Amino acid sequence: MQTGNFKTRRSGLVLSSVEGFRNVKGSFRDGCKEVQFLRIVGMDGTALMETAAMDRSLTEQMGRGQGFYNRKNSLPKLAALEDVEFYSGAYRNWADSGKHSVSLKTPVQNQQLPHVISGACAEILGLLGQGKQGMNQSIEKNFIAKVLFWLDEIFSPALQAWKPDYVMKAVFANISKPQEYLFCYLLTLLGADVLLLQAKQDIPAELEGL
């Protein structure tokens, strides 16, 4: 994806372990951020130990101001009425802007980021609609509202500190729903490295090409 002078590309480096994901740092040159989108199916004892070590190491680095890290076992539910109203309004504002800029609860310092997020939302919305029967504005609104909510809930510190070469890593467990998987993909479009630990569930085959 490319938005303005910021773009991302999938790293050609092949990783197969949690430790490899922890240690990798993609390059940034000529406005292009190299990112990882890694999926590990099954968790053995080694992977569990490497995950614990990753939590310690990357949390310590974040505490020293060296990038952002977050690991989640599940994505939060958009349920509170005030949140539903806010993010439904954020979707309408995004649509009214021609899908060029997006607003969140998180105060964003970098003026480029709302446009980067907007472009990423448009891309994953297009992917959601591929081959989907009955795609309509209501489905579109509910999806984008959830995505913006998840960004605020999970990624707020990273959004506040964001710059094109900022180091961000996010880890999620047992992602199997298309909308959740597309959110994880969106994070890579913002420049984050993303790891999916699929111990119990995995994505459907049609999503593997992303």
Outline where the language-model segments fall.
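Conserved N-terminal ligand/cofactor-binding loop architecture of enzyme catalytic domains
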Residues: 1-20, 28-147, 207-210
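Short boundary motifs at domain starts and secondary-structure transition points
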Residues: 20-31, 154-164
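Short alpha-helical segments and helix-capping/turn motifs at coil-helix boundaries
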Residues: 21-23, 52-54, 178-184
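Active-site and donor-binding regions of nucleotide-sugar-utilizing enzymes
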Residues: 123, 128-209
